[in-house]
Amino acid sequence: MQFIDQARITVRAGRGGDGIMAFRREKYVPAGGPSGGDGGEGGNVVLEADGNLQTLLDFKYNRLFPAPDGRRGGPNRCTGASGKDLIIKVPCGTEVRHLSTGILLGDLTRSDDLLVVAFGGRGGLGNAHYLSNRNRAPEKFTEGRDGEEWFLQLELKLLAEVGIIGLPNAGKSTLISVLSAARPKIADYPFTTLVPNLGVVRRPSGDGTVFADIPGLIAGAAQGAGLGHDFLRHIERTRLLIHVLDGGAEDPVEDLLVVEKELVAYGHDLVERPRLLVLNKQELLDEQHQDQLVDALQAASGRRLILISAAMGLGLEGLLAQVWKELGV
């Protein structure tokens, strides 16, 4: 399934039904008064979070969402039927903004969360409303009002507690695949991961924690280079970051600084987020080189380094122990 995490849509609430002019015409009521009914309310447009959806793909080709109009009033003071609300399902984690102003309308984070994004127009008044002592046969009635119409920006931000970040080919996808049941595409070339991958990792209690493997960052990602800018938003909600470094890279210290710089440039307090620093592909390092690299990385980052080999399953228990400690579980 194609992963789409941004969409622009138009929502149009229903127009209110018109009021009408009518008079009582019973056989034994020769001077029947006004009886025109009111129009029904226009339908609202409502977004609803659905935990079964993972992408905004449904909005790629369908971008106009009109709610039904209210019906016109009837005689005998009958009010017209109101238009039914239009319910639009979106994934949990969807932010909704006005396209023109960028104003945040709502953030649908839990399944069944509801957000009214366009209100239906009010129904018009029938002539029965205008009966008075001075006017016993009013002919005045009003039309229904138009419903609201808005252009909206939908933005999906994944709901994961732990985000796995790093440069391309650092082994992030391999790591999430061995920690969870996720099966991302894995190969030995950059940008194998083109979309975020989610995996559920079991806590000691048996409960699940969602990990997200974010496509590799490169220098300039926060300004839109590579794939990073499109997907950095998906770690905004995380409680903990795991920064994976490639032990077989030419200069892991420089790689560390590149990602650190991108987190600072992107903002949203990502650089302040609790973070574990992980050196992957431990099996590629001899003991002397490993010791030197550990010292250099810890000095450059001010963090304790965790050594692992995701491919060989080394150091994973220690890594998870640190994750649970940071999350307080």
UniProtKB/Swiss-Prot annotation:
InterPro entries: G_OBG, GTP-bd, GTP-bd_Obg/CgtA, GTP1_OBG_dom, GTP1_OBG_dom_sf, OBG_GTPase, P-loop_NTPase. NCBIfam families: Obg_CgtA (TIGR02729), PRK12297.1 (NF008955), PRK12299.1 (NF008956). The keyword Membrane does not apply. It comes from Prochlorococcus marinus (strain MIT 9303). It is found in: Cytoplasm. An essential GTPase which binds GTP, GDP and possibly (p)ppGpp with moderate affinity, with high nucleotide exchange rates and a fairly low GTP hydrolysis rate. Plays a role in control of the cell cycle, stress response, ribosome biogenesis and in those bacteria that undergo differentiation, in morphogenesis control. Residues 1-159 form the Obg domain. ATP binds at residues 166-173, 191-195, 213-216, 280-283, 309-311. Monomer. GO terms for cellular component: cytoplasm. Its cofactor is Mg(2+). Disulfide bonds: none annotated. GO terms for biological process: ribosome biogenesis. The keyword Transmembrane does not apply. It comes from the Bacteria. Residues 160-328 form the OBG-type G domain. It is an enzyme of class 3 (hydrolase). Keywords: ATP-binding, Cytoplasm, GTP-binding, Hydrolase, Magnesium, Metal-binding, Nucleotide-binding. GO terms for molecular function: ATP binding; GTP binding; GTPase activity; magnesium ion binding. Belongs to the TRAFAC class OBG-HflX-like GTPase superfamily. OBG GTPase family. CDD domains: Obg (cd01898). Mg(2+) binds at residues 173, 193. This is GTPase Obg. Its EC number is 3.6.5.-. Pfam families: GTP1_OBG, MMR_HSR1.
